[in-house]
Amino acid sequence: MVEEHKNKKRRQEDGPADVPEKKVKVSKSEKKDKKEKKEKKEKKEKKEKKEKKEKKEKKEKKKKYEHTATISGSAQSSQGYTQSESLTNLPQSEIDSFLATNEVTIEDPHSLNLRPLLSFDQIQLNSKISAVVNKFPTPTPIQSVAWPYLLSGKDVIGVAETGSGKTFAFGVPAINNILTLGKSGLSVLCISPTRELASQIYDNLVDLTSNTNVKCVCVYGGVPKHDQVKNLKNANVVVATPGRLLDLIEDGAVNLGTVDYLVLDEADRMLETGFEDAIKAIIGGTKKENRQTLMFTATWPQEVRKLASTFMNQPVKVSIGDRDELAANKRITQIVEVIEPFDKEKKLLGLLRQYQSGSKKNDKVLIFALYKKEATRIEGLLRRNSYNVAAIHGDLSQQQRTNALNSFKKGESSLLLATDVAARGLDIPNVKVVINLTFPLTVEDYVHRIGRTGRAGQTGTAHTLFTEHEKHLSGALMNILRGANQPVPDELLKFGGHTKKKAHSAYGAFFKDVDMTKTAKKIKFD
């Protein structure tokens, strides 16, 4: 008994004996749960591994892209413009004579002092472009001065009258860069204020790229989007009006992230017509770094200066002619008649008999109305009087406007009736006479209207009908007439000089100029 007690105590101290474990029975549902948990864990680990791999690949791809971009940037830099020996050897007196004759002023914050090109053999371009530009005798003044700076990769502001060869001024360096650097995808964007001007720029660029594989596309409102969206695929150059381009961006049809050559043509016109916010939004979508920006404008008002200072990098400003001072082309004979408002239609018919009689029967005459309804009414008047007239204004479809413009250019119609949509930028050759049936809202528009004649070194005539309704503009008009050495009629003098002569005829003597060398500052409000 005592021995049994001792053995029992010993067993308690030594611990439990090695006895076989009893198996616990696991239910099917528990097995299923365990399996699902295991699969879920494996799936999660697999997903994390995949994400980690993708993240690594993305990082390596970005690094590779940045490296490529650096190489491309240095290649572009090494491709920088080199002045030809023949241009370098020209005497300075010849350069000075060119600058003085063409009233060229250059403001260069980089102090590069690049000489203007006086002939095409002084510039080295891709052979496919040279074949096109060599068809012209010499570069225009804006091309001569702008090309060296643009080919050097600088931002440029060109202040020059319309019809001065601005499309090739920015188009030649743009296409040359695409061909030389072997760029693919969307690289060049040109924004234009009107459908007609956008189409004109597009046609010129198509001619320039006719020997290349560079794809140019034009997008504007007034026509269906479908074909434009289709054409945008694989485009290298896009010419667009601001409204339609914004629509296409919002639709996801175009991505401007690769655009490194941005052109604003007729910048002053776009600001006048309320496109400032659209322009800023479009610029915001383009490439931020290493973007080359160009702005072409016929005038240089404060609004344009401010816009340029916000998104351009120390631009070189090139002015052809006295563009700070609003002035009319001196090759245009300006005639101003003060009449009663109700005499306009009768007077118009008399002027057409005067300017389209005898040997002048087929001379091109451009008539400006102020409003669309007025244009429609006058078009009917002229047709009733057996005149073959074409018309362009906002109530017409894009196809109708294009047909009318082509008809006038080809001489099928010798009369073109237009609202101010045609006053800026359009290249309409050989217009002999401009008739202002109704005076425009500003003298700036007056100067641009009459600038449709007297182009490319030719002379022209501008005949303006002025009424008491516009007398508040009489002083500004007199300044324009005197500045171009044109007679001021006594009837106009009777209205008095409502606008005094100032240091700047359009913007006064006390506007603040903008320093282009300073970057924009961010203002934070607490």
Curated annotation (Swiss-Prot):
In the UniProt record, does the keyword NAD occur? no
Annotated keywords: ATP-binding, Helicase, Hydrolase, Nucleotide-binding, Nucleus, Ribosome biogenesis, RNA-binding, rRNA processing
Known SMART domains for this protein? DEXDc, HELICc
Q: Basic residues compositional bias: what residue ranges?
A: 34-65
| Composition bias, Polar residues | 69-86
Q: Which residues form the Helicase C-terminal domain?
A: 334-496
As for subcellular location, the record says: Nucleus, Nucleolus
Q: Where is this region: Disordered?
A: 1-86
Instruction: Show the SUPFAM superfamilies listed in the entry.
Output: P-loop containing nucleoside triphosphate hydrolases
- One cellular-component annotation, GO: nucleolus
InterPro entries, per database record: DEAD/DEAH_box_helicase_dom, Helicase_ATP-bd, Helicase_C-like, P-loop_NTPase, RNA-helicase_DEAD-box_CS
* Residue ranges annotated as motif DEAD box: 265-268
In short, the EC number is 3.6.4.13
Positions bound to ATP: A160, E161, T162, G163, S164, G165, K166, T167
Under the GO molecular function aspect, what terms does this record hold? ATP binding; ATP hydrolysis activity; RNA binding; RNA helicase activity
PANTHER family in alphabetical order: ATP-DEPENDENT RNA HELICASE DBP3 (PTHR47958)
Q: Which family does it belong to?
A: Belongs to the DEAD box helicase family. DDX5/DBP2 subfamily.
Q: What is known of its domains?
A: The Q motif is unique to and characteristic of the DEAD box family of RNA helicases and controls ATP binding and hydrolysis.
So what does this one do? ATP-dependent RNA helicase required for 60S ribosomal subunit synthesis. Involved in efficient pre-rRNA processing, predominantly at site A3, which is necessary for the normal formation of 25S and 5.8S rRNAs.
How is this protein named in the record? ATP-dependent RNA helicase DBP3
The source organism is Scheffersomyces stipitis (strain ATCC 58785 / CBS 6054 / NBRC 10063 / NRRL Y-11545) (Yeast)
Gene this protein is translated from? DBP3
